[in-house]
């Protein structure tokens, strides 16, 4: 979780100070439910029935970090006295990153280490080719919960409606092009 900076504004609309918005337990609970909903929907559509081909779907995918960026992150956090494992399976690397993020909790260097760690990650993107979501460690993940804010969520809702009504799978190339367009925005 990256801190959200807010501005305090005077009567004339001029910023007079900044502060960090603290996420409340209710916010965290809603976020967890959104993650579960996104995961459930992706898994429900992504897992094909026995003997059937999976239907075309829009996934939110996130690849493993670039090894070179991980090495740079490791060298950076070493200056603060932390060690980061950069070799091994993707699960090993993920555990190492989580261990690092736990170690910096409530330390003066927390924000900078979290930001540099985030920059070492690949960017998540939309695709009809599911590779899972590395950052969340989910095999299936989509964006489903904000159809009024994100067009990919709207695509997911349309596909869900189509499939719930017994419709056939859609043209994968067309949807992959739409995903690529959304990734470029």
Spans of features found by a protein language model:
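Append "with occasional cross-activation on large, charged helical scaffolds in nucleic-acid assemblies
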Residues: 1-185
């Amino acid at each position: 979780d990256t801190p959200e900076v807010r501005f305090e504004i005077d009567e004339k609309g001029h910023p007079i100070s900044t502060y960090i918005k603290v996420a409340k337990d209710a916010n965290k609970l809603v976020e967890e439910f959104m993650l579960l909903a996104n995961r459930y929907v992706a898994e429900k559509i992504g897992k094909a029935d026995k003997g059937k081909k999976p239907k075309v779907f829009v996934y939110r995918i996130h690849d493993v970090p670039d090894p070179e960026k991980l090495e740079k992150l490791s060298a950076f956090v070493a200056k603060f006295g932390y060690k980061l494992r950069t070799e091994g399976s993707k699960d090993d690397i993920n555990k190492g990153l989580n261990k690092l993020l736990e170690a910096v909790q409530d330390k003066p260097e927390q924000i900078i280490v979290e930001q540099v760690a985030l920059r070492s990650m690949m960017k998540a993107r939309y695709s009809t080719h599911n590779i899972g979501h590395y950052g969340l460690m989910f095999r299936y993940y989509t964006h489903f919960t904000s159809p009024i804010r994100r067009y990919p969520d709207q695509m997911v809702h349309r596909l869900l409606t189509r499939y719930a009504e017994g419709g056939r799978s859609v043209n994968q190339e067309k949807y992959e092009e739409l995903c690529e367009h959304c990734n470029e925005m």
